[in-house]
Amino acid sequence: MRNRTLADLDRVVALGGGHGLGRVLSSLSSLGSRLTGIVTTTDNGGSTGRIRRSEGGIAWGDMRNCLNQLITEPSVASAMFEYRFGGNGELSGHNLGNLMLKALDHLSVRPLEAINLIRNLLKVDAHLIPMSEHPVDLMAIDDQGHEVYGEVNIDQLTTPIQELLLTPNVPATREAVHAINEADLIIIGPGSFYTSLMPILLLKEIAQALRRTPAPMVYIGNLGRELSLPAANLKLESKLAIMEQYVGKKVIDAVIVGPKVDVSAVKERIVIQEVLEASDIPYRHDRQLLHSALEKALQALG
């Protein structure tokens, strides 16, 4: 009997945020509605941060980025969604997609309803779920015991991070937990380690679902050195250990990394190590190479 391929899977779930999650989702977009992205909602910088400070609510920027990368049929709607205002006025720097999502959030009962309306408008088949539907921020405690609030400030830290928390304490979106419970394969990464990947794992319902799922879990590493100094100083095995510390169990079965990563200390996990970088954008994963690496990981997992 042949091993399963990605095309055989009924439910693939990817966790993360930023450009990394969007890249993974677009590389697997052929799965259509069998693909689900669970998206980080703690961003407080840029257009997203301005909207949150003015209007409250969850962070929409990472969700918009994922939607952008899943658009396969360019249209007036998709051009509007991707439009960013220039100039020096009040709208300068704002992304229209963020504003559209925020407006639909006001008109909807739940943020998830707003996302589904936009998915239908943009003809995106993959499901996208915010990690929580409640406003929440990331907080770090550094090795001096200082509390640092918000992704922007955490990214600027120069001292090691000792602990991460979400503030306030919010529940995970129930559909996100259900997606993990039903998954045949779970993927986390690539993305900024402390500010794109870790926030999702801080939700107790998500951590519990990851502890209980029989689905294999694959970590995809970044291709370049992170700008965040605390994250940049972490070795691969340390990142895996930190993620599993917060989940509460050894859950990562395979890792996919580039050829320059030191994997010598990674034990008892499948390692897929090969060229993954796109030729047109430095430090971004090539969609086809990433898809191929995920196929190899799935084959190795059996």
Curated annotation (Swiss-Prot):
GO molecular function term, any single one: LPPG:FO 2-phospho-L-lactate transferase activity
Subcellular location(s) per record: Cytoplasm
Disulfide-bond pairs as recorded: none
Keyword tags: Cytoplasm
CDD domains hit by this protein: YvcK_like
Pfam families given in the database record: CofD
Signal sequence, renumbered to the chain: none
Principal location class: cytoplasm
A GO term from the CC aspect: cytoplasm
Biological process according to GO: regulation of cell shape
Family: Belongs to the gluconeogenesis factor family.
NCBIfam families the record matches: CofD_related (TIGR01826)
Function: Required for morphogenesis under gluconeogenic growth conditions.
Name used for this protein in its record: Putative gluconeogenesis factor
